[in-house]
Amino acid sequence: MLPEPANSSHSSSTKKRSRCLSTSMQYKYLRRILKYRHMDFEFALWQMLYLCISPRKVYRNFHYHKQTKDQWARDDPAFLVVLSIWLCVSSVGFAFALKLHFLGFFKFLLWVVFVDCIGVGLVIASLCWFFCNRYLRISTAYNAGQQVEWAYAFDVHLNAFFPLLLILHVIQLFFIIDHPLFISRFIGNSLWLIALVYYIYISFLGYSALPFLRSTVVILYPVLLVVVAYIVSLAVGWNIGQSFMQFYKYRVV
C-alpha cells in the first residue's frame, strides 16, 4: 500500500482539530448564556445598529475576531439574547394588532422565537454551510483545512434576521392594511421585498467576508426570485402581510 501523501495527512488532521475546536467553542457558547454578566451587550447593540446602516463594518469585526480567537463565529451569546428580547417586544405589538389574549400571545411568541427565528435559521444555516463547503470553498495549500463553521453560518442568519425583524415586526405594524386596494398591497408587499432582499444581501456579505470562499455572488441569485414573486403578488392581488396575519391568528394561536 502506498503511503498517504503528507499534505493529505496534514489536511485531515487540520480538519479533525477544527471539528474538535468547533465543538468546544459551541459548548462554551451555550454555557455563557447562563452567565449574563460575562456578556458584552453594548457591543451586541453596536452590531445591531451597524447591521442597519453599514453591515460591512460588522463583518470586518469578524475578521478581527478570527485573528484573536481563532474562530469566525461569535463566542459571546449577547447578540442572540438581545435579539430574543427584540422578538419579545415586537411580539407584544403584534399581539395588540391581532387582538390576542394572553395564551394566544404566549403561543405566538413561542412560534416566532423557536420557528420563525431559530427553526428557519437552523435550516438556512445548515443549507448554506453545506453548499459553501461543498461548492464554494477554495482548496489550496494556504487554505488547507479551512471550512465555513456551522456556528458562523448561524451567526450570518442572525445578522440578516435582525433588520428583517425591524422591517416586518416593527415598521410593518404601522402599515397593516386589510383594505383590498392596490396601494395597500403595494406598501405591504414592498416592505416584504425590502426585508427579504436585505436579508439575502447581509447573508452575501457574511460569506463573501471569508477569504477561502469563491464566487459568493451566487448567494445573491435568490434576489431575482424574490423580485419576480413581488411583481406576481401585485399582479394577482395577493397581500402577503395580510396572509401572514391570518396564518398567525387562525393557525398558530
Give each language-model segment a name.
Residues Y29-L30, G93, L127, V170, ...:
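Generic structural signal of hydrophobic/aromatic residues within well-ordered alpha-helices
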Residues F108-L109, I183-N189, Y248-V253:
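Transmembrane helix-loop boundary segments of multi-pass membrane transporters
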